[in-house]
Amino acid sequence: MSISASEARQRLFPLIEQVNTDHQPVRITSRAGDAVLMSADDYDAWQETVYLLRSPENARRLMEAVARDKAGHSAFTKSVDELREMAGGEE
């Protein structure tokens, strides 16, 4: 979805609710340059993905793990709660 900056200004609060509900970013166009409105959760997930894939070696390991999982050869034996506990209890 793409809207003008003027329209975004008029519809800001409904747009914030929309991107948090449907997780579809909204492109806001203006003469000064375009911007994107997206949920903070989606933004944080993108930032985490960029961080994890920044290292070519880490990216390779992650892609191999995804391929193993898709092939049904997942070595994942701990629950999310167990992993959270191992990581210090953070969500």
From Swiss-Prot:
The keyword Protease does not apply. GO terms for biological process: regulation of DNA-templated transcription. One of its GO terms (molecular function) is sequence-specific DNA binding. Induction: Expressed in log phase cells. A member of the relJK operon. Pfam families: PhdYeFM_antitox. NCBIfam families: phd_fam (TIGR01552). Homodimer. May form RelJ(2)-RelK toxin-antitoxin complexes, in which the toxin is probably inactive. This is Antitoxin RelJ. It comes from Mycobacterium tuberculosis (strain ATCC 25618 / H37Rv). The gene is relJ.
